[in-house]
């Protein structure tokens, strides 16, 4: 079977391709090859700018032509590299040979071809290409989508800022809150964790076969290759070079990024579960789309499937991010190859997260506030004003206020407005205090 949305093994590239296709520009095989070509070209240009003595003859006017190799990189170019790899059995060496072919097409570059990939090991290319792809995916896809989710939550938090709502701790009625405030909890958490993620530096390894610039230094000992590497990685790639490494990246900063993404996932899971619960409690109804079916057996069903879909995808993403975070920083001695296949899966959690965010947004935008259900719960739970009453009585030095309210409310009998009012009338306090207590209701006792 040919690969398409019906035959793909992963639902990211199958069922959910419409939601994840933008990520192909960062995490597909094509994208990885293109990023490698970009790094190799920019490295060659930077050697020319140094300049190495053997590269002084290159006219800087050719640099933009060289950059067009990756700017105009096509699927045919990527296939040519794959064809070369079928012979070399080495993906990065195939990129080098492809670039030598491209230099031949330009003409006049024959004397300079051996400075493609000069002094480098494959991981100098991989450990710059992959971080660059992650950085750009975060900036162009991930951050905007998380921020869109936050913006939607803020809209609801503002719209429903004054809606009183019965809180639930341990699944039981607790001091009332406001719906808008509870949504703002998720805004606050997401914003803080997103800021933490954005503060994580995206770093790259660039230092030769074992991280010491051995080949560079033996060929050109007169140059400060560490400074060269720092400048190249920062100015040409927008990354931060790891100063001390083995053959491969330390991956500590990538691990920090993945851990930060996990925390954001955790907040989103919590949010999706809460909205799922509010729908179950009938605090929200859902917009119904004509023609849709909620159950193959029960015609009446309108299920919170978007929140469930989001939760499931976030769980998968978190599991993969956890493996990335704990596995990548561990490699035998100066390196083993276990990071290679793991890095090829970096895009997978991004895919599941994008699916989850879009499902969350779809679910949120289907919500219809059901105020009667919210107010009914408040009206049926007058026991929650007990905290307010006993606190005011404490203020007034009333004897044993907590115990008095406990005796009234911690029973299996229904606590109603009338029973609370009756209790207030029986208190040995001034009329002003009784008036203050009468004003407290489940609708008004919502704090700040």
Model-predicted regions and their roles:
Residues 2-213, 220-232, 294, 307-309, ...:
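A helix-coil-helix interface module used to build multimeric assemblies
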Residues 158-161, 202, 276, 283, ...:
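Alpha-helical coiled-coil oligomerization motifs
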Residues 2-29, 64-71, 293-448:
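Catalytic-core signal marking the mid-to-C-terminal active-site face
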Residues 223-247, 251:
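Active-site-adjacent "gating/activation" loops or surface patches in catalytic cores
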Residues 104-110, 198-201, 280-283, 318-322, ...:
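Proline-centered turn/helix-capping motifs that create local helix->coil transitions or kinks
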Residues 193, 240-242, 246-332:
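Glycine-rich anion/phosphate-binding loop at the beta-strand->alpha-helix junction
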Residues 42-46, 98, 102, 137, ...:
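Generic, well-ordered alpha-helical scaffold segments in large soluble proteins
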Residues 135-143, 147-150, 154, 184-187, ...:
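Short amphipathic alpha-helical segments with heptad-repeat character
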């Amino acid at each position: 079977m040919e690969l398409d949305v019906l035959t793909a093994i992963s639902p990211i590239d199958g069922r959910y391709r419409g939601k994840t296709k933008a990520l192909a520009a960062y995490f597909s095989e094509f994208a990885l090859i293109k990023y490698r070509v970009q790094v190799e070209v920019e490295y060659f240009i930077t050697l020319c700018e140094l300049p190495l003595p053997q590269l002084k003859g290159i006219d800087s006017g050719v640099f933009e032509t060289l950059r067009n190799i990756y700017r105009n990189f096509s699927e045919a170019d990527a296939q040519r590299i794959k064809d070369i790899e079928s012979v070399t059995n080495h993906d990065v060496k195939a990129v080098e040979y492809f670039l030598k072919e491209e230099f031949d097409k330009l003409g006049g570059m024959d004397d300079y071809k051996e400075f493609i990939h000069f002094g480098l090991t494959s991981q100098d290319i991989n450990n710059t290409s992959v971080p660059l792809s992650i950085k750009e995916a975060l900036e162009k896809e991930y951050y905007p989508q998380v921020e869109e989710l936050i913006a939607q939550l803020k809209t609801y938090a503002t719209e429903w800022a004054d809606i009183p709502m019965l809180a639930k701790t341990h699944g039981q009625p607790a001091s009332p809150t406001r719906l808008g405030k509870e949504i703002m909890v998720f805004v606050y958490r997401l914003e803080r964790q997103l800021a933490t993620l954005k503060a994580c530096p995206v770093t790259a390894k660039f230092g030769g076969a074992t991280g010491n610039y051995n080949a560079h230094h033996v060929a050109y000992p007169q140059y400060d290759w560490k400074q060269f590497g720092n400048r190249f990685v920062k100015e040409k790639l927008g990354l931060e070079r790891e100063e001390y490494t083995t053959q491969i990246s330390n991956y500590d900063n990538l691990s920090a990024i993945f851990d930060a993404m996990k925390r954001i996932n955790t907040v989103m899971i919590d949010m999706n579960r809460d909205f799922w619960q509010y729908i179950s409690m009938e605090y929200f109804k859902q917009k119904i789309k004509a023609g849709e079916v909620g159950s193959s057996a029960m015609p009446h069903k309108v299920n919170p499937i978007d929140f469930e879909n989001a939760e499931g995808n976030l769980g998968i993403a978190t599991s993969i991010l956890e493996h990335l975070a704990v596995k990548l920083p561990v490699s035998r001695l100066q390196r083993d190859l276990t990071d290679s296949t793991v890095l090829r899966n970096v895009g997978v959690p991004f895919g599941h997260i994008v699916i989850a965010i879009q499902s969350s947004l779809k679910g949120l935008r289907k919500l219809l506030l059901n105020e009667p259900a919210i107010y009914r719960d408040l009206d049926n739970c007058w026991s929650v004003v007990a905290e307010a009453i006993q606190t005011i009585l404490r203020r007034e030095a009333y004897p044993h206020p907590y115990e008095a309210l406990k005796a009234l409310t911690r029973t299996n009998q229904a606590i109603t407005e009338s029973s609370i009012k009756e209790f207030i009338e029986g208190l040995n306090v001034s009329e002003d205090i009784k008036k203050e207590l009468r004003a407290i209701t489940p609708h008004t006792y919502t704090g700040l």
